[in-house]
Structure formats: C-alpha cells, structure tokens
Curated annotation (Swiss-Prot):
The protein, known as: Exodeoxyribonuclease 7 large subunit
Underlying gene: xseA
Oligomer and partners: Heterooligomer composed of large and small subunits.
Top class in the EC scheme: hydrolase
Alphabetical keyword list: Cytoplasm, Exonuclease, Hydrolase, Nuclease
Function according to Swiss-Prot or TrEMBL: Bidirectionally degrades single-stranded DNA into large acid-insoluble oligonucleotides, which are then degraded further into small acid-soluble oligonucleotides.
Species assigned in the record: Chlamydia caviae (strain ATCC VR-813 / DSM 19441 / 03DC25 / GPIC) (Chlamydophila caviae)
Length: 555
C-alpha cells in the first residue's frame, strides 16, 4: 500500500482548515433565522442561524454590553456581520459575529448610507468646520428628554467633575415623528439667545428605528449651522447616527459627553492641585519656621526676663522725663526766688537813702555856696561901698528860687523813673509767673500723655503678639487635622487596592514558569507545561494536565 503524502495529525489538519477559513472568510454577511439562542450571564450570546436547508453555529462575545436594549429570541430574522472560524476540539466551523441587524433594518441602513454620502458631499461633515470646545464652560446646555436615565447620568457626572457651572435643560421628544423638528428648533433657539457655551445632544440606546430621528437632514443642518459647539451623545458606543458626523465632537455615551465637557475643567483642577501642592510645601516650610519662632517666644514668655528690657526702657524714659521736669522747675524756681529776693531786699531802701543823701549833698552844697556867697557879699560889701545891697539880695533870692525849682524838678523825675521801673518789674514778675504756670501745666500734660502712650503701646504689642500666636496655633492644628484626614483616606484606598486582600478571598495568580509573566487566558497554556501559582502565604509549581475552553463548551 502506497501513499502520495505522509499522514497528518488531526490537530494539524484542523489548524490548517482553521487558518484557511479565517484568511478567506474574515468578513462575511449571513442572513437567516435564529435558533438555540442562549444569552449567558457573562454577556456572551450563543446561537444558531439557519435557512430551509442549512444550519450554522455562531457566537457573539460581549453582546449584552452592545445590544442590551433588545434581547434576540428564536425565530428572529437577522443579518449577521462576522467572520468564520473553527472550534478545533470538535472540528466544527462557526461564525463569530460583531454586528447583528434585525430584518427590516436593512432598508434603513441603505437609506442611512445614501444620506450620509450626499450630506458629506455637500460639506456638512467637513473637519475644518468643527469648533473647539471651550476650556472651562460656564453654561452647559443639554437637549434631551427630561425624563429618563440619560439626564440623570449627565447630572451625576457634572456634579462630580465640574465646578461652578450653569446647566440649561431644553426638553424635547427624542423618538417619533415630531422628534426631529423639536430637536432642530431647540438647537436654533439656543443659538439665537446664546444661552450656553456648549451643547450636549443626548439620547439613550435603542434600535435603528428608535434612533432614526437623529439621522434626519433637518437636525444635521441645524447642527452644522450652530455657532455653539455641539457634542453628540446618541445611543451606545456601537450606535452611529448622522448627528455624530455633523457634531463638533462625538461621545460614545451621554455620560462620556459630560466627562468630555468637564475634561478641560479637570485639567485646570490638576494645575490648581499642583499649585496647591506647592503652596502646601511652602506653607509647611513657613509653618516650620513660625513654629520654631513660637517655641522661642514661648521660652521667652515662660522666662521672667522677657518683658524686663521693655519695662527697663519705660522706667528710664519716665525717669528722664521726671528729671527734665525737675530741672525745668528748679530753673524757674531759682529765677523766681532771685526776683523775689531782689524785690524783698533793701534795694528800694538803699535807692531812697541814696536819693536822700544826694538831696542832702545838694542842699549842703547849696548851703555851702550860700555861705560862701554870704561871706563874699560881706567881703564885697566891705570892699564895695557903692554896691546896692537890696538889689543883690533880690538877685540872690531869685537865684535861690531857680535853684530850688530845678532841684524839685530833678527829684520829681527821679521819683517817676523809680516808680516806672518798679511797675515794669512787677509786670515782668507777673508775666513770668504766668509763663511758669503755663509751662508747668504743659509739662504735666506731656508727662501724663507719654505715660499713657507708652502703656497703650505695650498693651497693643502684647495683644498683637497674643493674636498672632493664637492664629498660628489654630492654623497649625487645622493643617495637621487636614493632613491626618488625607492620610486616612489614602490609607483606606491603598488597603482596598492591596492585591493581598484578593488572595485572602481565595483567589490565586498564575505565572509562566520560565518567562515570569502573568497568565490570563487558557489559550496560552499547554499540556504537561509547568506554571507557578501565587497564593496568600506562598507559591507552588503546578503541571497542566487538561485544558478546557469555557466559552466554546457553552456553545
């Protein structure tokens, strides 16, 4: 018995068929009727698709996360987009789906593609017409249904991530015959009144019929004409409408749209947080310096000699003021006593005596001159026989009267001068006493004011120091308390993220024996290969004896 080629193992042949199918049937579209539909708790959908003559197994992984609004059932006519593959353990080929369209939706999809091409040719989807979102929007407009989970999701995200914003909700119908007109009118009115910095056009997921209002030309043209940037958040991540292409930004979900609006705010917050970290470090440094200063001041306060220099300076100042006042008082008192002694002395008496002596001298001199004249007259009388004695006596009496008159006038002048000098001296003493009293009063007021001023300044400095000390101590306690709270929160988060807590609940991690990387899929294992398993309290080496694919088994 001869053979043209060597025999092949079943696995080798199956792998060859699998590679051939996957390379030639990487994208296929199959139309048929569903049967044996099974939606697993994991979200994967296993099904069969058939027509009158044939049957084909299929799987749609993560189906529930993409099409949770409608659950397929046996008998549904569908169009499935996917690729062919081979399940090697059973030698069966199957289709792995990535899109599922119910019968009747094909016409809408064709209309969708035709409208999309026409509007794109007219420039409604041009990238250069896209507007940038504002950095920090102060007013956010939302065009959606006022009832439902969409608006609640948006509000929850905005309240968590945005700061100081104004939200305007324009209620519209998001499904039905009038939905397109209401939505386009809402966009036009928001632009006309310039009510918002950015608009979010939002709706939850649904079938292509439910979302068809957002494929109408009237909405696309309203979005293109809007001067306010618009974020389209219609349906789920796998749902696309013409509004998504016309809008300035497309968000996979309404919650993601709210996050996009707040993204720039988050960046600003990160910048502010970096500034806050710098301020905290600077405050810590400043607080450390102030704490040392407070401790030093506290040591001073605890010591008796802290206020001694201030008290000593104040005492020296008071003594200086008192000494100056005493010196001034002593000077004025000496001057006053000097004038008083001068007034109380026998100066006036001596001046009177001197005037009296002067008068006596004048009288005596006049008397002497009279005697001399008398003797001269007698002598002349004897010598001159023809002298008229009576005439001479008259002349003598006249001269005597003139002399007395001149002497009396001279004495009057001296008396008036003495009286004037006495009056001037009394006036000067009175003025001196008034000035002394005034200066004494001013010095007394100055002493009181200086004493009161220095006492007030000492009290003010003491109160200012106590207030500064209390403020610093309060700030220190507040900062320590806040840092303790932050430390407690971070410690709790680290405890929750600790992988050892996962091990305590009975879980383990597999690592490749040689390469030391984590094993997350059964496809990377081989029979009789060794792996390391990490548990809570140690590690162990295991040998792979059997490999099973849970997803393929369920199909």
């Amino acid at each position: 018995m001869t053979t043209s080629s060597p025999p092949q193992a079943v696995t080798t042949l199956t792998e060859s068929i699998k590679n051939l199918l996957e390379s030639n049937f990487c994208h296929i579209v199959v139309k048929g009727e569903l049967s044996n539909v099974s939606l697993q708790p994991s979200g994967h959908l296993y099904f069969g698709i058939k027509d009158n003559r044939s049957f084909l197994n299929g799987a749609f992984f993560h189906f529930k996360s993409k099409y949770f609004d409608r659950r397929p059932k046996d008998g549904d006519s569908v169009v499935i987009h996917g690729k062919l593959t081979v399940y090697a353990p059973r030698g069966q080929y199957q289709i792995i789906a990535h899109a599922l369209v119910y019968a009747g939706e094909g016409d809408l999809l064709q209309k969708f593609e035709e409208t999309k091409k026409r509007l794109a040719a007219e420039g409604y989807f041009a990238i250069e017409k896209k507007q940038a979102l504002p950095t920090i929007p102060k007013s956010i407009g939302v065009i959606t249904s006022p009832t439902g989970a969409v608006i609640q999701d948006i509000l929850r995200v905005l309240s968590r991530r945005c700061y100081q914003y104004k939200l305007l909700i324009y209620p519209v119908t998001v499904q039905g015959a009038t939905a397109a007109k209401e939505i386009s009118r809402a966009i036009e009115e928001m632009n006309k009144e310039n009510l918002a910095d950015v608009l979010i056009l939002a709706r939850g997921g649904g079938s292509i019929e439910d979302l068809w209002a957002f494929n109408e030309e009237i909405i696309v043209k309203a979005i293109a004409a809007s001067s306010i940037p618009i974020i389209s958040a219609v349906g789920h991540e796998t749902d696309y409408t013409l509004c998504d292409f016309a809008a300035d930004v497309r968000a996979p979900t309404p919650s993601a749209a709210a996050e996009i609006v707040c993204q720039s705010s988050e960046q600003q917050i990160q910048v502010l947080k970096s500034y806050l970290r710098y301020l905290n470090a600077h405050a810590q440094q400043l607080l450390s310096g102030k704490t040392k200063q407070i401790q030093q001041w506290k040591r001073y306060l605890d010591h008796v000699d802290f206020f001694r220099p201030a008290h000593q300076s104040l005492d020296y100042l008071c003594l200086s003021i008192e000494r100056s006042i005493k010196i001034k008082l002593s000077q004025y008192k000496q001057r006053y006593m000097q004038y008083a002694r001068w007034l109380q002395s026998d100066v006036l008496q001596r001046m009177t005596y001197r005037l009296y002596d002067l008068w006596k001298m004048i009288v005596q001199a006049f008397h002497n001159r009279l005697i001399a004249a008398k003797h001269l007259c007698i002598h002349q009388k004897k010598n001159l026989t023809f002298l008229n004695t009576q005439q001479f006596i008259q002349k003598l009496d006249l001269w005597k009267q003139q002399t007395r008159r001149a002497l009396r006038q001279r004495l009057g002048y001296c008396s008036q001068s003495l009286t004037h000098q006495q009056t001037s001296l009394k006036h000067f003493i009175t003025k001196l006493n008034q000035q002394f009293t005034k200066e004494n009063h001013a010095l007394s007021l100055l002493q009181k004011r200086l004493t009161r001023t220095f006492a007030n300044r000492v009290d003010e400095h003491r109160e200012s120091y106590m207030r500064s000390r209390e403020n610093l101590i309060f700030s220190l306690h507040h900062l320590v308390k806040r840092n303790r709270e932050k430390y407690s929160q971070v410690s709790k988060q680290l405890t929750l993220l600790n992988p050892k807590n996962v091990f305590k609940r009975g879980y383990a991690m597999l690592f490749d024996f040689n390469e030391n990387f984590a094993i997350i899929s059964a496809k990377s294992l081989h029979k009789h290969s060794c792996v390391r398993v990490r548990l809570q309290d140690g590690e162990a080496t295991l040998t792979v004896t059997d490999i099973q694919n849970f997803e393929t088994q369920e199909s």
